[in-house]
């Protein structure tokens, strides 16, 4: 008999104190009934449609307000093929902004506010552009956590000024600039 295999959890993070919807993808997850987290206070229930039917592989997660920030593990299953392998899941304290596609040019970059966890999907070997307004001398931290959430994403972060001049960049896999 095959066994359940969890390939991704989206979004890979949630803000503590809120309820969020998670979608899982993988193999042999048909009729997955549960998500099991490394902290039992993270509770997810299968999402139901307007007719009360379970929406396949979609769950509603309640994240307790007092839960410690950090990484947790999650597994999916409970259906015909058992419980899956684990994936990382991050609990943070910043509101989340999901960008289904990142702009491919500086001119078409979406403006975002500071103080958000941005979840985006840059295309391979391409920049995914975002725009933020900063004041001269303002210090900010930009961090990519792709490798912390079981992602194949290997980031290169760069900061440009409005004329397109690169001000700072980093090519490490765990990027902080």
What does each of the following model-derived ranges do?
Residues 2-45, 52-56, 63-65, 69, ...:
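Acidic, Ser/Thr/Pro-rich low-complexity intrinsically disordered segments
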Residues 86-114:
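Predominantly extracellular/luminal regions of secreted and cell-surface proteins
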Residues 65-95:
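Extended acidic/polar, glycine-enriched regions
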């Amino acid at each position: 008999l095959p066994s359940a295999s969890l390939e991704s959890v989206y979004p890979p993070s949630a803000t503590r104190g809120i309820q969020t919807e998670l979608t899982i993808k993988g193999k042999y997850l048909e009729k997955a009934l549960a998500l099991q987290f490394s902290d039992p206070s993270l509770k997810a229930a299968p999402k139901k449609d307007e007719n009360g039917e379970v929406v396949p592989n979609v769950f509603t997660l309640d994240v307790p307000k007092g839960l410690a920030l950090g990484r947790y593990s999650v597994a999916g299953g409970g259906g015909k093929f058992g419980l899956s392998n684990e994936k990382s899941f991050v609990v943070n304290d910043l509101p989340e902004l999901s960008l289904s596609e990142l702009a491919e040019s500086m001119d078409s970059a979406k403006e975002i506010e500071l103080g958000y966890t941005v979840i985006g999907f840059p295309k391979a070997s391409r920049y995914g552009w975002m725009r933020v307004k900063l004041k001269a001398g303002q210090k900010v931290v930009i961090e990519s956590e792709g490798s912390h959430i079981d992602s194949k994403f290997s980031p290169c972060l760069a900061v440009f000024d409005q004329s397109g001049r690169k001000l700072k960049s980093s090519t490490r896999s765990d990027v902080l600039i």
